[in-house]
């Protein structure tokens, strides 16, 4: 039985980790970490865990935690994991970090976009970017996993097959993304109050969103070219879900059938990436509560541009589900263990 600890278990991503791991036959959660609810019953914070989780919330003492568990999930704001991780910790436990601390390989880029100083840059190179569909073999032997961001996961998986095939101009990519309000976290903010978001949709972080360099870096690796994108996220009045519609110029003449064959080949063996039938657009309602990503592609022959689409649950494949997928690989378990729950509808 794998013993797990969660730092940040009372945030939305942390609570989703708890929900998934409670149904995982090979895992026991030993530590429910929370800075805000120390010594309070976890089930008093999340009533859905009543009579399911008897544990009390603890602090974020990583040194103590690593003496009690095999794997630590850090579902915390940027800067915390990098301030806690050490060689001593990594010699004892596996770390799966859901923050951005170890996703971006260039420390100057991280500090510029996130506006904080990185506390442990010596571990950046070692950290493995935890997108299982691309880095599966590297993940299996890692000590430190950088769990990808929600927007980057959906954006990358929507674009990846054509980027890898060298069929799109990597400096022409435009990513239009929309997310439910849980993506903004559980902290109290006026901008996220019901009356502020209901019956409205807005763009935010225009030309400045912190996920931009992460998407660019991963697309650059995939294509072997420098990727420079326009990324514009939007907040929509729903709890969960991300919808990505991305556009790019083609560099070769191809048919839609040829584009579809590239996607089919890229994802035919991927359990959690569902390439939809021709003419079917991804929808967030068909992936809610699941670890699935639905993708599709459409050729605009008139403009010679390609439209790449994706939908997923930002809290599952965009955070907790992907973290569990990484954990399964780290411990030699079937990658799908604990993650085959079908999407919830309605």
Question: Would you name each region that the model predicts?
Answer:
Residues 127, 227, 291-293:
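Short beta-strand or tight-loop elements
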Residues 208-239, 243-245:
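Oxyanion-binding "anion nests"
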Residues 1-199, 204-206, 298-301, 342-346:
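N-terminal Rossmann-like NAD(P) cofactor-binding subdomain of oxidoreductases
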Residues 22-26, 136, 164-168, 209, ...:
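Generic secondary-structure signature for well-ordered alpha-helical cores
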Residues 203-207, 234-236, 284-287:
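Short Gly/Pro-enriched turn/cap motifs at secondary-structure boundaries
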Residues 244-346:
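C-terminal active-site/capping subdomain that shapes the small-molecule cofactor and substrate pocket
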Residues 29, 170-175, 226-230, 272-277, ...:
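A short coil-to-beta-strand element that immediately follows conserved catalytic motifs
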Residues 12, 126, 153-157, 206-214, ...:
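Conserved active-site and cofactor/substrate-binding residues in soluble primary-metabolism enzymes
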């Amino acid at each position: 039985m794998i013993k797990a600890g969660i730092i940040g278990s009372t945030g939305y991503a942390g609570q989703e980790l708890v929900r998934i791991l409670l149904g995982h036959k090979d895992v026991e959660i030993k530590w429910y970490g929370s800075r805000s609810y120390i010594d309070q019953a976890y089930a008093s914070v999340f009533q859905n865990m009543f009579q399911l989780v008897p544990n009390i919330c603890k602090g974020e003492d990583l040194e103590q935690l690593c003496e009690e568990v095999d794997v630590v999930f850090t579902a915390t704001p940027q800067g915390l994991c990098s301030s806690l991780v050490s060689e001593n910790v990594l010699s004892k436990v596996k770390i799966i970090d859901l923050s951005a601390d170890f996703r971006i390989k260039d420390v100057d880029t991280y500090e510029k976009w996130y506006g904080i100083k990185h506390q442990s840059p010596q571990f950046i190179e070692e950290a493995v970017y935890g997108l299982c569909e691309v880095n599966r073999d590297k993940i299996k032997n890692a000590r430190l996993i950088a769990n990808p961001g929600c927007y980057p996961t959906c954006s990358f998986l929507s674009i990846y097959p054509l980027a890898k095939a060298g069929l799109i101009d990597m400096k022409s990519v435009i990513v239009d993304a929309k997310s439910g309000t849980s993506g903004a976290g559980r902290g109290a903010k006026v901008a996220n109050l019901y009356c502020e978001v209901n019956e409205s949709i807005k763009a935010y972080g225009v030309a400045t969103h912190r996920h931009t360099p992460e998407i660019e870096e991963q697309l650059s690796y995939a294509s072997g070219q420098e990727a420079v994108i326009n990324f514009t996220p939007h907040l929509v009045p729903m709890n969960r879900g991300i919808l990505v519609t991305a556009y790019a110029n083609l560099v070769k003449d191809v048919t839609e059938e040829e584009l579809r064959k590239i996607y089919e080949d890229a994802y035919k063996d991927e359990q959690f990436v569902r390439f939809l039938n021709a003419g079917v657009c991804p929808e967030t309602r068909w992936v809610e509560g699941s670890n699935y990503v639905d993708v599709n592609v459409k050729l605009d022959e008139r403009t010679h541009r390609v439209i790449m689409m994706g939908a997923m649950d930002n809290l599952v494949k965009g955070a907790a589900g992907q973290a569990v997928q990484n954990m399964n690989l780290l411990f030699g378990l079937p990658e799908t263990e604990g993650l085959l729950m079908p999407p919830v509808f309605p």
